[in-house]
């Protein structure tokens, strides 16, 4: 059984923070080969300047350890799209309490092919619970197509651009999407946060 945590940095134990850092390092640096500089003093952990007290973490846990994660950042503070990838947006990136950013999204449970979408929908639902009406992200056009195939409502914030061999695009998602709520209600109702019964039927 997979459990899901949704916590701020201070809500995670030191052991969980270390395991999350190792998982992110394995996925984003070792496996995907991202050219990112970690701010962690520990060699095999990946954290950056956007991991701060206002950050919200979504962490999927199996008996073997972390098997997925995502990160939510308020756009009223520093965040990836605004501070690193603003050129992907046709207009100024948002700075709005009703808009959050999703980043560091990954899933790696081979025995659950739907885990990636479950974590994605849970991240949107968590953002909605925190007061977001929309969620922005920087991703590849391949991931954009993956989201569309899985029924995700989204819109581009600017045209795709080639960056270091990858075609990146900035996109925005409505935080509340019935498709995602239906999936979570079917498989993991215990993951839902603050959903009124009238919205969950």
Swiss-Prot record:
Domain of life per record: Bacteria
Reactions mediated catalytically: a fatty acyl-[ACP] + S-adenosyl-L-methionine = an N-acyl-L-homoserine lactone + S-methyl-5'-thioadenosine + holo-[ACP] + H(+)
Biological process, per Gene Ontology: host interaction involved in quorum sensing; signal transduction
GO MF annotation terms: N-acyl homoserine lactone synthase activity
Class of this enzyme: transferase
E.C. number(s) listed in UniProt: 2.3.1.184
Statement: the UniProt record of this protein carries the keyword tRNA-binding: no
UniProtKB keywords: Autoinducer synthesis, Quorum sensing, S-adenosyl-L-methionine, Transferase
Homology family: Belongs to the autoinducer synthase family.
Described function: Required for the synthesis of BHL (N-butanoyl-L-homoserine lactone), and HHL (N-hexanoyl-L-homoserine lactone) autoinducer molecules which bind to RhlR and thus acts in elastase biosynthesis regulation.
The name this protein goes by in its record: Acyl-homoserine-lactone synthase
Organism this protein belongs to: Pseudomonas aeruginosa (strain ATCC 15692 / DSM 22644 / CIP 104116 / JCM 14847 / LMG 12228 / 1C / PRS 101 / PAO1)
Gene name, Swiss-Prot/TrEMBL: rhlI
């Amino acid at each position: 059984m997979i459990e899901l945590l949704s916590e701020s940095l201070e809500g995670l134990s030191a052991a969980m923070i270390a395991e999350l850092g190792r998982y992110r390092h394995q996925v984003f640096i070792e496996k995907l080969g991202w050219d990112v500089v970690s701010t962690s003093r520990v060699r095999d952990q990946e954290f950056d300047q956007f991991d701060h007290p206002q950050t919200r973490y979504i962490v999927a846990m199996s008996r073997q350890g972390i098997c997925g994660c995502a990160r939510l950042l308020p756009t009223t503070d520093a965040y990836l799209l605004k501070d690193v990838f603003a050129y992907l947006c046709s207009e100024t990136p948002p700075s709005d309490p009703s808009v959050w950013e999703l980043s560091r999204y990954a899933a790696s449970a081979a025995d659950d092919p739907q885990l990636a979408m479950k974590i994605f929908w849970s991240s949107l639902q968590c953002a909605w619970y925190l007061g977001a009406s929309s969620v922005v992200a920087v991703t590849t056009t391949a991931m954009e197509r993956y989201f569309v195939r899985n029924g995700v409502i989204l819109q581009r914030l600017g045209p795709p651009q080639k960056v270091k061999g990858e075609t990146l695009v900035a996109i925005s998602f409505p935080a509340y999407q019935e498709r995602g709520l239906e999936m979570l209600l079917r498989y993991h109702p215990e993951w839902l946060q603050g959903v009124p019964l009238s919205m969950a039927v």
